[in-house]
Amino acid sequence: MKTSITPGEILLKEYLKPLEISQNAMARAVGVPPRAINEIVLGKRAITPPMSIRFGAFFDQSETFWHGIQVECDFRSLAKEKKSLTKGITPA
């Protein structure tokens, strides 16, 4: 079963491909190594707050837009682990 969509998939399918922007061109434009963009696209690297600010500037969006997508993805991934993370914790 496929996991939920990643921020990198959104970046590639909804932004880079439709706008005909290569990963290398985006990397140059936002001042990061091409490998950083490629690893985000492949789901091997998270979008950090500094990267979210860069992406927001590049796509003329909120600074927090991409970070918000990353946080949502992180919480969806953790949903499977919720029981083990909260086992033995009693609410105050």
What residues fall within each predicted segment?
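A short, Lys/Arg-rich alpha-helix, primarily the initiator
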Residues: 1-21, 68
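Short alpha-helical "recognition helix" segments of helix-turn-helix
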Residues: 24-27, 55
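Recognition helix of helix-turn-helix/homeodomain-like DNA-binding domains
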Residues: 31-47
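Short, basic-rich loop-to-helix N-cap that marks the start of a DNA-contacting helix
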Residues: 44-57
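Short, charged recognition helix plus adjacent turn
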Residues: 67-92
